[in-house]
C-alpha cells in the first residue's frame, strides 16, 4: 500500500467526515474500462494490457489483468480500509457490472474515437470544466 496515496485519501475522508458526508464515490475502474492506460494502441503505462485500442472482438482481450486482477483488489482494499476508518462508505460506480457492460457494448469506433471519449463527450455536452488529456490523481 502506498503511504502517499493512503495519506491523501485519509485527508479527503477526514474533511468529508467533518462536513458530515457518509459516502465516498470512488473513481476506481474508470481508467481500466475507458482506456486501459493507453490510446490508439500506445501504452501510457507499463501495466496497460492493450494500449487502449479496443478490438472488434472483445474475447481477444478478456479478462484483462488491470481490471480483473490484483490492481483493483489492491485499490479497493486501500479505499475500504481508509474510508472505513473515518466511518465513510465507499461506492464504486465504474466497477458496476451494468456500467462496464454498457461501455463495452459500444462500437470499437466510438470507444477508440478519442482518449476516454465517453467521459470527454459527457463533460463537453454538460459544459463541465476539465483539463483535456491531463490525468490528475493521487
Positions of the model-derived regions?
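Short secondary-structure boundary micro-motifs
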Residues: 7-8, 57-59, 65-69, 75-77
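N-terminal glutamine amidotransferase
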Residues: 9-13
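A mobile, often basic/glycine-rich helix-loop segment
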Residues: 34-66
